[in-house]
Amino acid sequence: PAHLSDEEAATLPCAAVTAWHALVGEGTLKAGDTVLVQGTGGVSIFALQFARLQGARVIATSSRDEKLARAVQLGASDGINYNTTPKWDERARELSGGAGVDYVVEVGGAGTLAQSMRAVKTGGQISLIGVLTGGAGQVNPLPILMRNIRVQGIFVGSREMFEAMNRAIALHHMKPVVDRVFPFGEAVEAFRYMDSGAHFGKVAIRR
């Protein structure tokens, strides 16, 4: 999209198209749906933005209240601090009228999947796009069967999805959230910053 800087455009081929794939490519997201996004990293923030473009409601989770405040400024209707609210799945159901959310953008993996299954509504969808808590763990698959939950693995996206996403970004003049831009000589510092979890959105390196 012509309105983006080089750094902003560089965030699109991986994080952005992954979020688009989750909600649009493999989903049927529509206005009025409720989406739960875990955390405030690159994919989750893009998912928040794309969901809002579609007229959906977004609930965000984070371990930091200041990040939740920024998510609300970006369009989330509610934020849940999972440190102070460990049963964030119950809170998500409360915020969605007791039925559960329509979509979960799942970044935690084995450590959070069971709670995501409790947070999502019967017939809802969980898009697994990351395993930040690790891949090993015990998850009871029975709720997936009995409540008709769709769990979909998402890994980046196709060229067709990428082109459709870019048309939507251009039409709405959407701007990716780039937290910090590091010069190439400070690449190590950039990775350390990202590893610290302090970032909100994307971290870019400019050569």
Residue ranges and their predicted role:
Residues 1-6, 70, 98, 172:
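Glycine/charged-rich beta-loop-alpha catalytic/anionic-binding loops adjacent to active sites
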Residues 1-38, 73:
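NAD(P)H dinucleotide-binding glycine-rich loop of Rossmann-like/cofactor-binding domains
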Residues 18, 43, 111:
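Hydrophobic/small residue at the entry helix of a nucleotide-binding pocket
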Residues 34-40, 52-115:
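Adenosine-nucleotide cofactor-binding segment
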Residues 39-47:
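Glycine-rich adenosine-cofactor-binding loop
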